[in-house]
């Protein structure tokens, strides 16, 4: 019974709590490590050293957005520092902004270990420390209305707000910053915040759903599970399981449907229903669903793993769009052809997918992450590499979140919106899945110019340097540097779309390479070993199913979705032939890739990658009118993806 744990309050076991004001020394946590009972993959990346065309994009965003965000938004923390006396106009999700930012900054630091990025992250930790209440509270709301107090007030009519949701993002960002940089203060602040939430809700006998907006506020279960791993505090594990097994089924008034409902995610998953068929299919729920992966890892309870698997496959089969984005609008609808996905959808989808990749060790999942990264995620970043869009459309144009979501902003925080605060986490999330460590070796998922530094399960430092122009072409050269010679398995992701892949190790051709799998190379690895890969970069397609959006097709070159810009003479209705699309000619251009093609009427058309096609606000098309020369592929679990039609 979770409510019987820690009745004297949660926090008494934390030594030497921080002294106000900031400048205190946080204790190092020495709890024994929580055992991984199911042997999940881990991210042991130290520095990705990302280079090439993608590296230029991400580094530019790091320079003009990440490293200047506090300077450009000087009142970002004002409501946190002065919750009882501030005049800021606050959206109900105001508390998420600094946490989302720090989560992205942590990942961004993994890209290049830029000391200016570390300085920004450390400064945010200091501001969190200064703002934290004596009871651990880490949000922007006054005592009278925080948590569920406004909802419970009989003299107030309100739908409530996203208080534990905002604190969840702050706790997660602090936790990840601690993991990546070793900043003990970040972990200490996160623990104090979580203890405050535990004391108010669990010890105080309040339900999390009493705040309403349960699809958001139940994300705090993920924080409880993660910090159980970090600290070993059993009450955190009990709280996480209580939220999943009880609060996910509790009813609350839903703002969107104006009905009483429960999220019911576990029930839906175990009944084999897709996420859109659950009680609450909003995108925010994916952070709550991440609790399942951690609980599976620390308990070994197969029910959590089964639910995680069911939910992921249900989403990829019914709600993943041609861009690799998730859901239509702001949630799952069961329609992969729907118009547009919010940037925040994409960030949550990639976080959830990364968890499932670590659990499943299935290269299919890594293929989906690559699809999402190169298209939906990069596609959320506009020209200038500073601003992100609110909505990513398969066809149409992109507009800055600073315009569409201006109502989220406030004096001294004019850049702030849910998507602008979250966008950097989306594009930097590649550092979370690029190269993973298992108990018997490494899993290489990302191909692109880089010099990735990681370690094996035994603690041996290994660097994989990639020299390549991928995805512009399919040639990749990998040079190994190992601190010590070591025998382990290096698993190379062979994309499902690369039908004929050639792999060489130190010049010797490898046998048995198959598309859609990890190719395993078991040997004693030493400095100077060289791996060469040549991927099959033939065009492949997603033929829209009959009865959906008409005779349309999406064209892919490797992981890149292709699109063309419309004009007075080149319209969304312009028709192409499949054979012509298959034989497009590569040319030099402004995109990551560019191709020349002709329409059915003989018009010359330039195709580029989806990211490049709309970054300046131009109208574009990625669902292309074409003859039905290909049979459609229906979704099948573990089968050939719908976007890999030949």
Features from the language model and the residues they span:
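N-terminal export leaders
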Residues: 1-2
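C-terminal motif of bacterial Sec signal peptides marking the signal peptidase cleavage site
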Residues: 7-9
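Glycan-recognition and catalytic cores of secretory/periplasmic carbohydrate-active enzymes
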Residues: 14-646
């Amino acid at each position: 019974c979770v409510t019987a744990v820690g009745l004297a309050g949660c926090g008494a076991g934390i030594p030497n709590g921080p002294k106000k004001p900031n400048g205190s020394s946080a204790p190092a946590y020495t709890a024994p490590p929580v055992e991984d009972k199911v042997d999940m993959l881990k991210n042991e990346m130290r520095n990705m050293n990302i280079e090439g065309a993608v590296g230029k994009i991400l580094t530019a965003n790091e320079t003009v957005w990440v490293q200047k965000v506090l300077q450009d938004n000087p009142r970002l923390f004002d409501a946190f520092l002065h919750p009882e006396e501030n005049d800021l106009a606050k959206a109900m999700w105001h508390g998420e902004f600094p946490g989302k930012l720090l989560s992205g900054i942590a990942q961004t630091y993994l890209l290049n270990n830029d000391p200016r990025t570390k300085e920004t992250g450390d400064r945010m930790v200091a501001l969190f420390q200064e703002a934290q209440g004596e009871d651990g509270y880490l949000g922007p709301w006054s005592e009278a209305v925080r948590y569920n107090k406004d909802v419970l007030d009989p003299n107030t009519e309100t739908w409530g707000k996203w208080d534990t949701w905002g604190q969840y993002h702050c706790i997660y960002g602090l936790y990840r910053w601690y993991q990546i940089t070793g900043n003990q203060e970040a972990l200490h602040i996160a623990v104090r915040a979580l203890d405050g939430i535990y004391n108010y809700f669990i010890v105080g006998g309040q339900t999390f759903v009493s705040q309403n907006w349960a699809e958001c506020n139940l994300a705090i279960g993920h924080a409880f599970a993660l910090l159980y791993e970090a600290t070993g505090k059993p009450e955190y594990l009990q709280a996480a399981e209580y939220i999943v097994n009880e609060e996910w089924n509790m009813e609350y008034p839903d703002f969107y449907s104006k009905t009483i409902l429960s999220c019911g995610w576990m029930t839906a998953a175990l009944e084999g229903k897709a996420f859109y068929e659950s009680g609450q299919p909003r995108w925010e729920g994916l952070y709550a669903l991440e609790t399942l992966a951690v609980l599976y890892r620390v308990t070994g309870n197969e029910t959590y793993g089964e639910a995680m698997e069911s939910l992921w496959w249900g989403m990829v089969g019914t709600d993943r769009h041609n861009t690799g984005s998730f859901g239509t609008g702001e949630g799952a609808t069961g329609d992969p052809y729907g118009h547009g996905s919010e940037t925040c959808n994409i960030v949550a989808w990639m976080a959830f997918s990364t968890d499932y990749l670590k659990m499943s060790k299935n290269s299919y999942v890594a293929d989906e992450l690559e699809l999402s990264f190169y298209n939906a995620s990069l596609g959320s970043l506009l020209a200038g590499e500073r601003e992100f869009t609110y909505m990513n459309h398969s066809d149409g144009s992109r507009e800055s979140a600073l315009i569409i979501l201006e109502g989220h902003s406030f004096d001294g925080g004019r850049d702030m919106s849910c998507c602008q605060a979250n966008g950097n986490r989306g594009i930097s999330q590649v550092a979370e899945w690029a190269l993973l460590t298992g108990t018997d070796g490494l899993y290489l998922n990302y191909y692109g110019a880089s010099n990735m530094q990681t370690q094996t399960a035994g603690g041996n430092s290994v660097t994989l340097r990639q020299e390549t122009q991928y995805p512009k072409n399919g040639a990749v050269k990998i040079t190994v540097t190992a601190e010590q010679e070591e025998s382990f398995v290096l698993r190379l992701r062979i994309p499902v779309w690369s039908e004929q892949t050639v792999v060489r190790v130190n010049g010797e051709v490898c046998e048995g390479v198959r598309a859609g799998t990890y190719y395993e190379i078991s040997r004693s690895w030493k400095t100077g070993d060289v791996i060469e890969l040549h991927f099959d970069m033939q065009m492949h397609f997603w033929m829209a199913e009959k009865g959906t959006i008409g005779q349309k097709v999406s064209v892919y070159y490797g992981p890149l979705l292709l699109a063309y810009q419309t004009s007075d003479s080149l319209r969304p209705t312009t028709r192409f032939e499949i054979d012509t699309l298959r034989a497009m000619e590569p040319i030099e251009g402004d995109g990551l890739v560019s191709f020349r093609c002709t329409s059915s009427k003989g018009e010359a058309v330039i195709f580029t990658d989806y990211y490049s096609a709309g970054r300046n606000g131009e109208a574009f098309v990625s669902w292309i009118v074409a003859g039905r020369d290909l049979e459609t592929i229906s979704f099948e679990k573990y089968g050939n993806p719908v976007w890999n039609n030949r």
